[in-house]
Amino acid sequence: MAAGKLKKEQQNQSAERESADTGKVNDEDEEHLYGNIDDYKHLIQDEEYDDEDVPHDLQLSEDEYNSERDSSLLAEFSDYGEISEDDEEDFMNAIREASNFKVKKKKKNDKGKSYGRQRKERVLDPEVAQLLSQANEAFVRNDLQVAERLFNEVIKKDARNFAAYETLGDIYQLQGRLNDCCNSWFLAAHLNASDWEFWKIVAILSADLDHVRQAIYCFSRVISLNPMEWESIYRRSMLYKKTGQLARALDGFQRLYMYNPYDANILRELAILYVDYDRIEDSIELYMKVFNANVERREAILAALENALDSSDEESAAEGEDADEKEPLEQDEDRQMFPDINWKKIDAKYKCIPFDWSSLNILAELFLKLAVSEVDGIKTIKKCARWIQRRESQTFWDHVPDDSEFDNRRFKNSTFDSLLAAEKEKSYNIPIDIRVRLGLLRLNTDNLVEALNHFQCLYDETFSDVADLYFEAATALTRAEKYKEAIDFFTPLLSLEEWRTTDVFKPLARCYKEIESYETAKEFYELAIKSEPDDLDIRVSLAEVYYRLNDPETFKHMLVDVVEMRKHQVDETLHRISNEKSSNDTSDISSKPLLEDSKFRTFRKKKRTPYDAERERIERERRITAKVVDKYEKMKKFELNSGLNEAKQASIWINTVSELVDIFSSVKNFFMKSRSRKFVGILRRTKKFNTELDFQIERLSKLAEGDSVFEGPLMEERVTLTSATELRGLSYEQWFELFMELSLVIAKYQSVEDGLSVVETAQEVNVFFQDPERVKMMKFVKLAIVLQMDDEEELAENLRGLLNQFQFNRKVLQVFMYSLCRGPSSLNILSSTIQQKFFLRQLKAFDSCRYNTEVNGQASITNKEVYNPNKKSSPYLYYIYAVLLYSSRGFLSALQYLTRLEEDIPDDPMVNLLMGLSHIHRAMQRLTAQRHFQIFHGLRYLYRYHKIRKSLYTDLEKQEADYNLGRAFHLIGLVSIAIEYYNRVLENYDDGKLKKHAAYNSIIIYQQSGNVELADHLMEKYLSI
């Protein structure tokens, strides 16, 4: 410390004498000087340094120090005289320490030289002594240029001359060349390595010049020489903290705190480091220890007060004298209230840092950062506040669920009303910053009413004094998705010019966007862009607002700009990284320290601790659950009140439900790896994005293309499932219903493909596909959507999937026929040989179950519950297979299976119709010798079909029977009889569908017979528009 004062005095005196024409060193000297410094930099390379006080961050992986460089160093620093082996070794160790080299152990000799023995005073060469004398004289007369030149000459001839380096540094300091001064003193310190005070001067100067690495090294040398130099430990710890070396900074402050646990500044720094190191609970514990110590002290004061009257006057007088010698540093209020107690004894036994409102404010912030102990935080803050206000006896407030003790609501409390007047007159108001933090904790527990009660106290304060608290409350409300309330606290900030920034415009615009006030949102997003035109996130949000305002041109234009700017920013980042090294290499050499900061090992922030991740997960899950429940309730109300009759109303419903489904789909736990695949529908479950901005650009790009893409999760996430029946506030059955309803509504009102993608996502969810009933429902919903598509292959695949899963199920077989009742795609599927082979294998599988034997070519048995003791056949399988054979013109084969059906269901109209048509078509193929007999046989079945329809069915089926019989006669050329049945269709029934077909066929017959007038009449009556 004395050396530091000496340097300052010397600087002040010399500065007064310094002439105005003091110039820079000549070019030759400067070149020589920096040439030397470059040599020294090469010498100060990074190897392992053995001293435990020197930080390991200074250890670099370089080549080992070799003997050639040792020799060159000695040659440069040689005084042209013989030097002892010990002198050589000591000096080399000093240079190795300067460059973080490993210090070599001294060789043992037979002389028994003791370790650490002082070396003899060096004898200077006469020439060097003469130059040094001349340099000192020039320095004294303030001829700094001459002095600098002479000292450089001294260093050339005697590179180990401490005085030359030290005084040369003084000259640079007077000239304002502080970096050169620091470098010179740094070398001088190595030549006088045992002077820790000089090391400290160099360390402080290095820190002032922001030469962090060099400053840390110098402070480490100070601490290694004087482990009790607490200022150096403090300064080095602050440098560690600055460079992100949290573990080393924490170690330093822990040592300081152990040495002086009553320094509030050290306590605060240690608490901050604990927070930075993700040890928030340790920070809270520090302040709780201080609080408990204060509680214990107050209890001791109250106990001592009872015995104060028994103490002697002499003892009190002695204590008064001692008190005069050492004034108390804290608890002045206690001394004023209780002046007669034995304060000497209290201070000696119960010394502690005072716990006041400032300490409580810090404690409240720590509980906010902890995020998982809001309830405990609220209780602790209330307890501490009562203690500060000397109301610690009012413990009944601990059982009050709200914070009414701090406002006028306390007068409604019966227990408070029964207190003594002295207790009621005590202070109950808390500082506004603590009240706001208490409100933030309440908000984190989803107690919005109590939180707003605290925030509204801001209205009673001078606005300019608490503007930052307005912003803090508004930001927290935005984070909690209470957008309308957040607007109330953001809006007043606009009246202050210093708050009209992007930090306010951006969240305020988001709030207006969320409440669908898009015009106002657009205004604030535009203001934010004026403040920060390169912020792409704001531009993306504004583009989305234009989309919501039905301005597609501006939306697409902004989106193109954002994409281009994003590419440009990525290119700029890569270019900047590639140029960093070259820019560092070309920096001015005169501004570099000997130990360059660029050689620091790159600091990597430590990974998040499991505790930190768990805390964030709990907080996030709580917010998501509240959002899910809220949206679900809104969706239910909308469904009940508005219905889904209009496409516009359906779109609103779809938007709400899509957000819920996206939240569910983001949970990676639900998707088995073996079943996961890329998903390209409205729910992008497998695509991952590097940043939120990339996701937003991708999503808006889909909107620009007209796709139905809704905002969803950014990336897959893994969630700890704590319940087997629900997720995020909804039961799995409710989630399943949302998926199914959403798929059907989207398929109906928007896009069949998007509706199908929702079902496919649900089929990949393990909690769904492990439930047989849900699996059945998903397959039928998917079939219902596929039926709206004109995709023959997709329909056939889904039908086969159903038939395989629900093997031999008659309802599923009915669904198969219902699904293929119209259109050319249905006929193509029925006539496909693939379907014929599929059902033949199913028939064989059924027969194997029926006769309890293996059948060659049968399908695998998936239905293990087939019970057929009477060995009955399956009419559904026979009928479907017969239809497939009939559709592919295999009439004879079809008749074989239809004949088997006739035995079981002789009065089924469709069996008789198919048998009749099969006989007729077989006869028309001219592949039988008795064609006319087969036609008669076919007509017999057709008349039976007609009779069954006429006697047992409605007019619609009767009309169908007349038409089919007429069409059969038309086929075999008996047109007069065909016309009779066609006329029945035209005249006896009201339904017009078959009338058009009957009229068209009648027109063909009349035209062939030459009756054009009657044909025109039918054309005009039935086929004209």
From Swiss-Prot:
This is Transcription factor tau 131 kDa subunit. GO terms for biological process: 5S class rRNA transcription by RNA polymerase III; transcription by RNA polymerase III; transcription initiation at RNA polymerase III promoter. Residues 1-71, 309-334 are annotated as: Disordered. Phosphorylated. Changing residue 190 to Y: In PCF1-1; affects the rate of recruitment of TFIIIB to the template. Increases the amount of transcriptionally active TFIIIB. Increases RNA polymerase III gene transcription. Keywords: DNA-binding, Nucleus, Phosphoprotein, Repeat, TPR repeat, Transcription, Transcription regulation. Residues 128-569 are annotated as: Sufficient to bind BDP1. It comes from the Eukaryota. Changing residue 728 to G: In PCF1-7; increases RNA polymerase III transcription. TFIIIC mediates tRNA and 5S RNA gene activation by binding to intragenic promoter elements. Upstream of the transcription start site, TFIIIC assembles the initiation complex TFIIIB-TFIIIC-tDNA, which is sufficient for RNA polymerase III recruitment and function. Part of the tauA domain of TFIIIC that binds boxA DNA promoter sites of tRNA and similar genes. TFC4 is the TFIIIB-assembling subunit of TFIIIC and essential for viability. Changing residue 192 to L: In PCF1-138; increases RNA polymerase III gene transcription. Gene3D superfamilies: Tetratricopeptide repeat domain. Disulfide bonds: none annotated. Its main location: nucleus. Present with 876 molecules/cell in log phase SD medium. The modification Phosphoserine is found at residue 311. Residues 46-65, 311-325 have a biased composition (Acidic residues). It is found in: Nucleus. One of its GO terms (cellular component) is cytoplasm. TPR repeats lie at residues 128-161, 162-195, 196-229, 230-263, 264-297, 432-465, 467-501, 502-535, 536-569, 875-908, 959-992. Component of the TFIIIC complex composed of TFC1, TFC3, TFC4, TFC6, TFC7 and TFC8. The subunits are organized in two globular domains, tauA and tauB, connected by a proteolysis-sensitive and flexible linker. Interacts with TFC1, TFC3, TFC6, TFIIIB subunits BRF1 and BDP1, and with RNA polymerase III subunit RPC10. Changing residue 162 to S: In PCF1-139; increases RNA polymerase III gene transcription. Pfam families: TPR_16 (PF13432), TPR_8 (PF13181). GO terms for molecular function: DNA binding. Residues 1-26 have a biased composition (Basic and acidic residues). The keyword Transcription regulation applies.
